């Protein structure tokens, strides 16, 4: 939503401001298509040459994140607190045997079935199930600090992979000004081949070449770089829910009372997604 609004404002102010000061938009509009063939084609080729199909799919998904925004809302954070707390309470009161069916087959679990949105996130499900599976097979003898280190390593690996679209967008932003110069230089070369033409024609050709530099800079700093920043924000926002999972599991393994465990996890959530104290503890009653 805001990305689309930002694009409209950006293009409106740049081209509208130019027209408002008496500039003629027609030469720019006529030059943009062939300049964009060079700049866009070169950028596309560079991205394809430097990445595998997996990264290219992630790159496309990065644009979706820019316009869609974060996946998880306040209700999802409330649900993940309920889900993990229920499993940890079951592990503590009923033992590993009670929790094992739920972590071995989450899709058939009556606990996970209450949270279909969370069940769609395979990273979240694996984080919960793999960690609890580790606790179950160790018969509760694991050092909580060691479990935390294992979870941190897994989350770092996931983040390194998830943040790649933002890095690719930023790399594109860094390259676009240079690709704009490439288009401009080619335009100048073309102009030099027509040096015997009248000044009016040469001026139009030089102006057309300069549109390449203009487009490269505009695309880099007006679109690609802001998109990269927004993509990074969305990825980091969605990753916060995994920290809630870790907080509840580790605090429970340390033997802290469940209310303290839940409040520690709740208070660590950003205010925009943080469930109210009453919502959490009223919802936990009877679970």
Show the residue positions of the predicted features:
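Large intracellular
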Residues: 19-163, 237-287
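N-terminal start-of-chain detector that recognizes signal peptides
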Residues: 1, 62, 71, 222-223
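Alpha-helical transmembrane segments of integral membrane proteins
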Residues: 2-9, 34-38
């Amino acid at each position: 939503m805001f990305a689309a609004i930002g694009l409209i404002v950006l293009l409106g102010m740049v081209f509208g401001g130019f027209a408002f000061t008496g500039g003629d938009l027609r030469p720019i509009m006529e030059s943009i298509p062939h300049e964009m063939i060079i700049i866009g084609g070169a950028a596309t080729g560079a991205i394809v040459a430097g990445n595998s199909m997996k990264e290219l799919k992630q790159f496309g998904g990065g644009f979706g994140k820019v316009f869609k925004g974060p996946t998880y809302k306040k209700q999802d954070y409330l649900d993940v607190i309920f889900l993990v707390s229920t499993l940890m309470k079951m592990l503590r009161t009923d033992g590993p045997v009670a929790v094992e069916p739920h972590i071995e087959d989450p899709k058939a679990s009556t606990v996970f079935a209450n949270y279909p949105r969370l069940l769609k996130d395979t990273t979240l499900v694996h984080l919960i199930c793999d960690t609890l599976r580790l606790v179950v097979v160790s018969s509760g003898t694991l050092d909580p600090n060691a479990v935390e280190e294992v979870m941190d390593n897994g989350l770092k690996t996931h983040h390194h992979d998830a943040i790649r679209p933002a890095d690719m967008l930023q790399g594109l932003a860094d390259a676009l000004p240079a690709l704009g110069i490439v288009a401009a230089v080619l335009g100048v070369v073309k102009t030099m081949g027509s040096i015997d033409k009248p000044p009016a024609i040469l001026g139009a050709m030089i102006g057309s070449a300069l549109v390449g530099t203009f487009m490269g800079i505009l695309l880099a700093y007006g679109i690609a770089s802001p998109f990269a920043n927004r993509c990074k924000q969305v990825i980091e926002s969605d990753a916060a829910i995994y920290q809630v999972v870790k907080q509840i599991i580790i605090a429970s393994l340390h033997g802290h009372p469940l209310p303290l465990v839940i409040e520690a996890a709740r208070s660590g959530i950003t205010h925009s997604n943080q469930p109210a104290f009453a919502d959490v503890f009223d919802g936990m009653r009877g679970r």
